[in-house]
């Protein structure tokens, strides 16, 4: 692989855990920061050697020490160490002319504001570490916003029905506008983008929240998900149909203000985007296995002089070291499959197939929109 863009973040595991309950957490932090800085210097040399690769450093999400939960006592001081690590990342980004995206402070601020109302609120799962679905969605929002995508609509259509005119169309094509004597408005609509489908179902291990809940804490819909249809010059109520499917009913006043089609989950274009979303989740599930395999190789086996040995001896070594690393048990089953090159090749081909299919399905289609007077 020769990526043109690389994003890099670290800090949660590097900042330690149970050591903050030990006899001398201050000494631990000093040792750990020296180790992190030394390793990061080596990382920077590698990244700088790839002149044609754009680097984006990410300040990772916080460890939520302030969430009130009697069953999970926090490691006090851990988040301060994470913040020290993020300062190293930010300084390196400035020095090397790399981009920097901050997840840490915006997530910390949402937790602060919401916990002032309810101390049991958190964007994390029950471990104070991993963001729940709404936290992950906020991370996606902050990343996309940092790329300058805020304020760019999915599409916008502005029609004056009384004058039978398309006043404006942004990021889309509008043709064949007709206004009948009975008050029906119809036209063809080809957007250049699809709406962003935010899952309203809690998915994933230990997840209790949904992606859509993130809209309560940031203007995601307003900034990134505007597919606006505005029609002026109407009276009464109108049924919106897209490709013959009844979507909803709106008053002339609502249509004059503009309705956000991206907020309607039953439109054909939204359902088209949902298909892409689910395919991408499958791609991510497979791609995650390669990351876990790489962790096992470089964090465990490389230290044993068995990097990419991928044989029974390597497997025996991993089993013998299960007690030395709390994360290894969770990766062992994945390694037992990915140690075979045929498995890695098959899964890599699946990723390529899923990506190709995603791009095929994601192509916007010409839709027929009708507003039928009731």
Give the residues covered by each predicted segment.
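Alpha-helical cap/lid subdomain in secreted, periplasmic
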Residues: 1-137, 141-374
């Amino acid at each position: 692989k020769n990526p043109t863009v690389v994003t890099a973040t670290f800090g949660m595991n590097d900042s330690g855990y149970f050591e903050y309950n030990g006899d001398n957490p201050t000494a631990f932090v000093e040792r750990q920061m020296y180790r992190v800085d030394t390793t990061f210097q080596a990382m920077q040399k590698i990244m700088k050697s790839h002149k044609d690769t754009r680097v984006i450093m990410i300040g990772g999400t916080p460890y939520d020490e302030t969430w009130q939960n009697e069953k999970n006592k926090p490691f006090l001081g851990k988040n301060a160490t994470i913040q020290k690590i993020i300062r190293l990342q930010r300084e390196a980004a400035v020095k090397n002319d790399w981009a920097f995206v901050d997840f840490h402070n915006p997530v910390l601020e949402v937790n602060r504001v919401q916990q002032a109302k309810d101390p049991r609120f958190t964007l994390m799962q029950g471990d104070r570490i991993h963001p729940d679905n709404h936290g992950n969605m906020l991370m996606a929002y902050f990343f996309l916003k940092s790329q300058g995508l805020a304020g760019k609509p999915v599409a916008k259509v502005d029609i004056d029905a009384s004058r039978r005119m398309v006043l404006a169309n942004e990021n889309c094509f509008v043709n064949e506008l007709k206004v009948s004597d009975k008050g029906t408005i119809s036209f063809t609509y080809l957007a250049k983008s699809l709406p962003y489908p935010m899952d309203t179902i809690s998915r994933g291990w230990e997840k209790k929240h949904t992606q859509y809940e993130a809209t309560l804490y940031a203007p995601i819909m307003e900034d990134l998900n505007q597919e606006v249809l505005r029609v002026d010059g109407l009276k009464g109520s109108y049924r919106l149909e897209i490709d013959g499917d009844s979507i909803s009913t709106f008053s002339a006043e609502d249509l004059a203000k503009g309705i956000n089609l991206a907020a309607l989950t039953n439109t054909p274009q939204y359902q088209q985007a949902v298909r892409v979303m689910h395919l991408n989740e499958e791609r991510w599930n497979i791609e995650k296995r390669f990351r876990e395999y790489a962790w096992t190789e470089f964090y465990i086996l490389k230290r044993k002089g068995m990097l990419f040995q991928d044989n029974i001896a390597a497997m025996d070594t991993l089993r013998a070291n299960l007690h030395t690393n709390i994360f290894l048990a969770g990766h062992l089953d994945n390694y037992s499959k990915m140690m075979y090159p045929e498995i890695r090749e098959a899964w890599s081909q699946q990723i390529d197939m899923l990506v190709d299919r995603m791009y095929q399905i994601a192509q916007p289609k010409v839709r027929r929109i009708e507003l039928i007077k009731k």
